[in-house]
């Protein structure tokens, strides 16, 4: 390499992987294994009560073309846990290729996981491919949320170039019970004001609860709706509850999501959500 080598050829792409395994031992849910490398980190803060929290962090500060990021959590039989991210994830303009994120969680028999990542903010020219999958053993359940914000309204940002593919799925006994693919590109952004697309919304979220008695949460969930500037729809059947939300800005969406999660969980959100 010499002084004439193009800067773009010298840029290093981030690559991170974090794996956390929780299991019941001596009457409590404890950390059994922790493996992490590169830009992906995981830590377990001190919390009140007997439900541990796992916080994942991308130390690279954001995602751009060619980056790789993987988060995995294994929740043992009869264990309950909450997992989240340290902050909002940001996907910046991609120089070449797409950033790829893989989130794979497994919940053992009669276990429960609240997967509560903070929102993903997409910037102009971002290229991101993400797969989120939660696999539930018999008797297990989960609560999952995914929020996406198209630029920062407060900064006057409007997106016209984007390549975003996002697939979220929940498997119960190896069979998919919730599958939600989302694809947004330049053409979709151009049509985003139409009723068939986002209706002018710049922020969207999906909440899904799967497990025994999930349908019973429909009433409390609907009662928790009503944040100004947020449109929402909720349905429940066959052991699952699904809510979809649209908003013109990320802040009212975040407030509505936080209220819903607090109601559905019956306790406060992880502290990192409150910072």
Curated annotation (Swiss-Prot):
Transmembrane segments: none
UniProt keyword list: Chaperone, Cytoplasm, Nickel insertion
Protein's name according to its UniProt entry: Urease accessory protein UreD
Family annotation (Pfam families): UreD
Entry-linked InterPro entries: UreD (IPR002669)
PANTHER family: UREASE ACCESSORY PROTEIN D
Function per UniProt: Required for maturation of urease via the functional incorporation of the urease nickel metallocenter.
Organism expressing this protein natively: Cereibacter sphaeroides (strain ATCC 17023 / DSM 158 / JCM 6121 / CCUG 31486 / LMG 2827 / NBRC 12203 / NCIMB 8253 / ATH 2.4.1.)
An example molecular function term from Gene Ontology annotations: nickel cation binding
Main localization of the protein described in the UniProt heading: cytoplasm
HAMAP family for the chain: UreD
Subunit field text: UreD, UreF and UreG form a complex that acts as a GTP-hydrolysis-dependent molecular chaperone, activating the urease apoprotein by helping to assemble the nickel containing metallocenter of UreC. The UreE protein probably delivers the nickel.
Localization per record: Cytoplasm
Similarity section: Belongs to the UreD family.
One Gene Ontology term, aspect cellular component: cytoplasm
